Amino acid sequence: MNNPARDVLKEITRAADFGFDFLDLTLEPPAARADRVDAKRIRTGLEAKSLGVVGHTAYYLPFGSAFDAIQTAAITETERCLEVFAEVGATLMNLHLDCRVPGHDPSFINRRNLESIERLLPTAERLGITLMVENVEGDDAESLAPVLDALPMVGLHLDIGHANIGKGRKSNTESLLKRYGTRLKHVHLSDNKGKSDDHLAIGAGTIDWRREMRAVKATGYNGTFTLETFYGDSTLITYSINRVRELWASLT
């Protein structure tokens, strides 16, 4: 994934130099906001490096806001992202459900998230982009069900790091894939120690990667994986890439 604080074109080169097959392009401030990037130059840069692209949006867009104007602003910003992603060649774009709306219960928040996605679907369909919901910390199949069950055309974006956070909790990967494995569209990979979203190199935390990757492979999935390791030098990134590829190839 590109670092949104850095120039996108330089991040394309960096992704190619590491040997990635595609760029998980996040459109968010400070340097990669949708209305501030040059989509044509990004597409040219991706094509020059023979990289595919997957669309990613900011995790803090307030789709569940109790203020109509703020919810609408979040939708408008995401529609802007959709337009950019279509121009650069993406066919997938993720969303994070809003889960922090003070003074309102989960049913209200779920309803607002659902409304937001329903308003985004016509633009996504027009542009040929499939929307997918990424699980955040604490999400399991039950917590995502009010939205995903109501929107069968929306895919699952599995974040294995997020699925392994929570004191006293087991991994939520199994429950998510048991219910939505046939809708899996994209996977994020990063390690942690079970307490916070550390974005560590693969093997630096406590996640059982053989168990997690076996669960993914059992669904028949053979799509894209993003190594979402934000900390450490290039050696750790290269190690993580090789570890994931070797582990995936070893599973039957």
Locate the predicted segments by residue:
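N-terminal pre-domain/capping segments
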Residues: M1-L82, A86, E142, G155, ...
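Active-site groove signature of glycoside hydrolases
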Residues: F85-D105
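Hydrophobic faces of well-ordered beta-strands that scaffold small-molecule active sites
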Residues: M1, L23-L25, V53-T57, M93-L95, ...
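Alpha-helix-loop-beta-strand connector modules within alpha/beta enzyme cores
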Residues: A39-Y60, L114-A124, L151, W209-E212, ...
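Acidic-and-aromatic substrate-binding clefts and catalytic sites of carbohydrate-active enzymes
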Residues: M1-D7, T26-K40, P62-A69, V101-D105, ...
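Charged helix-capping and loop-helix junction motifs
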Residues: D35-R41, I70-E79, S107-I117, G168-L177, ...
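Short, well-ordered coil/turn segments that N-cap beta-strands
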Residues: G19-D21, E47-V53, V88-T91, E125-T130, ...
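Histidine-acidic metal/acid-base catalytic patches
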Residues: A5-A16, A141-I160, N164-T252
